[in-house]
């Protein structure tokens, strides 16, 4: 049914009044905001994870949570997202609540340390206030908070050791996210919370694992990534890295429950070349015959490690293979990022 002229006039007057009171753009027709509907993304540094996320990376203007066990690659993944944002000309900040930031390793992951903003706050309130100020500046592309578990409320720091303060951190996170969510959306900043796992006591059925900081972050996060180490990579008897699996537990911008696997090497972070070999082989772009790998009729090398070194020394060829993978995989991500089954009673997935 077409809107009547009287209704059209009343609606226009009301919208004009709202704009005058709350600012231009406070209300608009979706057709007028079509340019804002497209979701921009920042790559993660792993092409497999970019494809699993469905939009080519983590979404701008959203909250992202990365959680998993210790030494699973949470901070490494966050640092690669920072590196990718910097390559796009972005400004990034790292709020180091754990006071454990390693600039040498971050540089190996591709982070431009000279341009990275780093803060090591004393309390959880200070960390979240700094985050809010950076978001409202509209000048930051990525903010990483490492980690939620280290956001200790001021009252707990000023109190005596052993004082019981139940729920204080959860209340702090809930209040902060209520204030931050709108500002994050308007600023197009990606705010990444790194989180740790804890065990629930007395759980008889389902997973006893849960994340710290209460329930608020689970609701406000548009993307939640569960990262786990599945294998230790060795060269002879020496451990040189880890094979990790990332499950997209929640995704508000694309279909969720997909997963990706990639290598994290001790001296360079996420192995881009290893990722390209794995996915290129799955898609048939790279052909494997015995121990040899081929691109079309051209021989790349014998053995995965030799091919990885060859691609590392030939960045133009690596870029071309990556372009072919993205053109094929992003149109059909389920080919290499299959959906995974998540239990309804798993504590991590509760919302």
Curated annotation (Swiss-Prot):
Entry keyword Transport: no
This protein's name: Protein RecA
Function of the protein: Can catalyze the hydrolysis of ATP in the presence of single-stranded DNA, the ATP-dependent uptake of single-stranded DNA by duplex DNA, and the ATP-dependent hybridization of homologous single-stranded DNAs. It interacts with LexA causing its activation and leading to its autocatalytic cleavage.
A Pfam family it matches: RecA_C
The keyword ATP-binding is assigned to this record: yes
Signal peptide range in chain numbering: none
Superkingdom assignment: Bacteria
Family: Belongs to the RecA family.
GO BP terms, alphabetized: DNA recombination; DNA repair; SOS response
